[in-house]
């Protein structure tokens, strides 16, 4: 785990960057001609303390969107069959909905769909928030919610929601639920700008653009650097960061 990244000597003339990191209880340091910081934006100011104050402030702007992906294993999906549905949208409940997983198709592998008497996985999604607050404050409240919520609360809410949605189809949680897996993501997804809450910055002046500016032999790449929570954006930022170092032979 990297703990400190700094230029060896003055940033303007440094020929190397030193990275201090920990592994198995010991601390090590390694030097390189260029470094790409690909961690979360909000962690970078703590790791690279020499960054300009304005850049640190920009890196702290975004707040990760907390998420919960819950998977419920059912012994059968007779209740879905009887109701003639594959999922239920419920934006006012603890999870915003539930839906049966589609059979996987990976490479040459093709899962064989089972009948209503066969087991099935059901996916649920929750985005903890606090309505009425600005979006970043809602995300912070969501972080706290995920850190303090017990599994018992999740289980009771899930069982209740399944009964409300599938009870008319004969669903019985004590009989039909085989297992529950709750994947909590307090760190969640990269913050994306919203015109309801965020200013309309001129080109080049948004926090993600200021935050990802090259600093000597250090560049920055991650989905936060694009203010977009998608793999393609992270790849684009990685390409940019490497090119910034390669274009002037820094590496």
Regions of interest found by a model, annotated:
Residues 1, 8, 37-38, 221:
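Generic beta-strand/beta-sheet core signal
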Residues 1-18:
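A conserved short coil-to-beta-strand element within the FAD-binding core of flavoproteins
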Residues 2-5, 32-33, 40, 120, ...:
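C-terminal substrate/ligand-recognition segments
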Residues 12-13, 29-30, 63-65, 115-118, ...:
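Extracellular/periplasmic catalytic domains that process cell-envelope and extracellular macromolecules
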């Amino acid at each position: 785990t990297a703990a400190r990244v700094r230029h060896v000597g003055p940033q303007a003339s440094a020929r190397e960057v030193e990275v201090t990191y920990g592994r198995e209880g010991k601390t090590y340091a390694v030097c390189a001609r260029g470094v790409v910081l690909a961690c979360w934006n909000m962690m970078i100011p703590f790791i690279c303390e020499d960054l300009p104050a304005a850049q640190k402030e920009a890196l702290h702007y975004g707040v990760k969107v907390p998420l919960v992906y819950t998977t419920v294993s059912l012994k059968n999906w007779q209740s879905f069959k009887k109701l003639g549905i594959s999922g239920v949208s419920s934006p006012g409940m603890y999870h915003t909905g539930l839906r049966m997983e589609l059979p996987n198709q990976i490479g040459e592998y093709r899962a064989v769909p089972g009948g209503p008497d066969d087991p099935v996985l059901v996916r649920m999604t929750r985005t903890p928030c606090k309505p009425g607050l600005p979006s970043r404050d809602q995300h912070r409240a969501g972080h706290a919610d995920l850190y303090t919520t017990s599994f018992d609360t999740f289980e009771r809410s899930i069982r209740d929601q399944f009964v409300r949605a599938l009870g008319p189809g004969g669903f019985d949680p004590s009989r039909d639920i085989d297992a529950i897996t709750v994947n909590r993501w307090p760190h969640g997804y990269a913050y994306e700008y919203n015109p309801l809450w965020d200013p309309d910055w001129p080109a080049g002046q948004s926090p993600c653009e200021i935050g990802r500016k090259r600093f000597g032999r250090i560049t920055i790449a991650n989905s936060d650097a694009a203010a977009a929570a998608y793999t393609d954006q992270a790849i684009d930022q990685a390409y940019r960061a490497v090119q910034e170092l390669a274009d002037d032979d820094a590496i």
